[in-house]
Each structure stands twice: as C-alpha cells, then as structure tokens.
Amino acid sequence: MSSALANIYARLPVSFTHGRGVWLWDTGERRYLDALAGIGVSCLGHGHPGLVAAISEQAARLIHTSNIYEVPQQAALARRLAELSGMSEVLFNNSGSEANEAAIKLARYYGYKQGNTHAHIITMDSSWHGRTLATLAATGSDKARQGFGPMPSGFIQVPYNDLPAIRAAGEAEPRVTAVLLEVLQGEGGIRPSDMAFLQGVRQLCTERGWLLMIDEVQSGIGRTGKWFAHQWADIRPDVMTLAKGLAGGVPIGAMLAAGPAAGVFAPGSHGTTFGGGPLACAAGLAVIDAIEQEGLLGNAHEVGAHLHAALASELAGAPGVIEVRGRGLMLGIELDRPCGILATRAMEAGLLINVTRERVVRLLPPLILSGEEADQIVRILVPLIKQFLAQQQ
C-alpha cells in the first residue's frame, strides 16, 4: 500500500475495520483472534461498552484544556492509581517512552538535589524502555541504538536477574542514584525476574539510598493477574511507569512516585502539553472500573495459567522448543531459531501474534480472554510452530 507515511514499520499486509471482544475483522470481513491486543494495549479487547461510552461521553463534553488548569478527570485517575499501587503521586504523559523519560529525569534531579551533578542509573541487559534518546540509552539493545549516537551518558548496564552485578556496579560507581528494571521483560523476550532478585534489589536500594524504578509499561494494569507485576514479589518501588493498557487504546502514560521519590519535582521541572487530558483520563477510569467489576485480574491469572499449561503440554518434547514462560496473559514461547515468519503464518490462519528477540513468540491477549478462546489460540498456534520447526530441520 503506497502512502506518504514514513517507512519505519515492517507492516503485515492486513488492515482492520472493526472489532468486538478479542476479535478483529479485516476489510474483507475475515475474522482474527487478537492474541496481541495492539502489543498489550487493548486490555479490554475491542468495542468494550463501558470504555466506548466513557470515551464518547467525555469527547462530547470536553477533549482538551491544559495542565495550567485543574483537570478533574486527571485528579480522579491519579487517586485511583495511588490507591491501587500504594504510591503517593502521579505524573501523566502520553506514552511509555515519555513515562520512562520522566523517571530518568526524576532520578537525575533526585541526585542533583543531593549534590550529585552526574547521576548514574543501573539498567538491565535485554531491557526495553523506549525510543527517546535517554530511554534508548537505558535500553539493553545495541541494535536499537545503532546510528543514533552519541547516547546520553550516565547508564550502567548489568545482567538481568543478577543482584551481585548490581551491587558491584554500585561499588564501582559512587554516583549511582537509581536502578531501573522490568519485572517481566517484554521486548526482551518475556523474561521474568526472580522474586528473590526483586526483593534483594528492593533491599539494596533502600540500604544505598537509591531509587528503585520499575517499568510496568507492558506488565502493568492487570496483565499478569495483579494490578502491577511487582506486587507478586510483595515490594513497592520508589518510581513506577505505566502506559499501554492504562486507557485501553487511548494514548496515555504515567509515572508514579513514592517515598524518597515523591516531591522531587516542582513546578517548572517537568511538564507536558497533552499528558493527563480529560479524554485519556476518562478512558483510564473506565478501564480500572471494568477490570474491577468484571474480575479481570482473576481472569488474567486463571486463563493465563490455563493457556500457559496448555501450550507447555502441547509443545513438550518438541524439537526446537526451548521454553514456554511468562505470567498471566503475558506469555512467550522461545524457539531455538529465528521465527519471525510465524507472525505472518499465524495471521494467515486467523491469529494475531508477534515475535520478539527474533525467536520468541509473544502472546499479549486482552484480559477478557476466555478459556475457550485460549484453547483456540493453542489449536491454531501449536501446529504452526511444529510445522515451522519440522520444515527447518
């Protein structure tokens, strides 16, 4: 399809006209089971009545004013997020990259206020935090940074799930002010952190006076079966970032702060034109209401466990399958070879997925996914994987 669009996406040859629940329809009225949810964004699926009503009603009243005025919807969503997370304050923006950029700025400003004029942040290998220059510098992907140097300095990358490496990095660099990590790496191949590792990092940050900053852009808002994935480890970060599913498809991001990170910013130290507008925040409130009222945390946990077990059982012993892993409805199937073609083959079979880290099939279906729909994913995907592996022998 020729267009005036910048050539930055390797798009699949399909476009969709409408959706309902976990299903999408293309221009030829063919139906697809959406097991990707816009890469974890459409957490309520498509056409959710409560979300549609909230967006429609708010759009009819007021779409945008400015953050130089009070925004009641913004204040209401901030209160709900604070209640759910135990955090103290919320800064809204428009995306995960912006949320993480704000977190990086906060960590540097936190250090600056303590006399550290070149604050350093410890980050993890294989991580993903965004495409702005600072978030790229924090991201554990040389490929993503290629051609965009020089990168901002002040980031120290260590192996994921390696507490001694974090401790050693802090001993080697006295200007460390924060640790930034994902509880469950998404773009990094659906790699979960150990609960003991998370608890150890929390303790280490407390001992050293560092901020623990957790990127929940992909894993937050119920995807793993709790509101936020770090809650499985029974810890609280000092900074948390959110986006993707927060407003069910309306662009929004958020940076939450607590403890020593709360109150670091002051008027003029950060800002955004569109962040936390009435429309996006009304959508965010509707998403939280739906997750609570429809029991979607429990559904994500139970249906996710069912899907995980079914995939693991059907693929057990299959040559070329390394592991099925993840939590809730954030799952990955790692193969021993590049498998990007599986996204196309699955689409041709009526299933939407994607592949990350070249050889990990990623599943991020809506939180409303039923057990029957999970079984449909298995029935379509498992034969495709086995056929692909057999052809590659």
Swiss-Prot record:
Gene Ontology molecular function: identical protein binding; N2-acetyl-L-ornithine:2-oxoglutarate 5-aminotransferase activity; pyridoxal phosphate binding
Keywords linked to the UniProt accession: Amino-acid biosynthesis, Aminotransferase, Arginine biosynthesis, Cytoplasm, Pyridoxal phosphate, Transferase
Positions bearing N6-(pyridoxal phosphate)lysine: 244
Pathway(s) of this molecule: Amino-acid biosynthesis; L-arginine biosynthesis; N(2)-acetyl-L-ornithine from L-glutamate: step 4/4
Enzyme Commission number: 2.6.1.11
InterPro entries given in the database record: AcOrn/SuccOrn_fam, Aminotrans_3, Aminotrans_3_PPA_site, Class-III_PLP-dep_AT, PyrdxlP-dep_Trfase, PyrdxlP-dep_Trfase_major, PyrdxlP-dep_Trfase_small
Tree of life domain: Bacteria
Annotated positions binding pyridoxal 5'-phosphate: 215-218, 273
EC top class, as a word: transferase
Catalysis: reaction(s): N(2)-acetyl-L-ornithine + 2-oxoglutarate = N-acetyl-L-glutamate 5-semialdehyde + L-glutamate
PROSITE patterns for this protein: AA_TRANSFER_CLASS_3
Cofactor note: Binds 1 pyridoxal phosphate per subunit.
Subcellular location: Cytoplasm
SUPFAM superfamilies (alphabetical): PLP-dependent transferases (SSF53383)
Binding site for N(2)-acetyl-L-ornithine: 131, 272
GO annotation terms (biological process): L-arginine biosynthetic process
Cofactor dependence: pyridoxal 5'-phosphate
The family this protein is said to belong to: Belongs to the class-III pyridoxal-phosphate-dependent aminotransferase family. ArgD subfamily.
HAMAP family linked: ArgD_aminotrans_3 (MF_01107)
Note: May also have succinyldiaminopimelate aminotransferase activity, thus carrying out the corresponding step in lysine biosynthesis.
Subunit structure comment from the entry: Homodimer.
Designated name of the protein: Acetylornithine aminotransferase 1
Source organism per UniProt: Bordetella pertussis (strain Tohama I / ATCC BAA-589 / NCTC 13251)
UniProt gene name: argD1
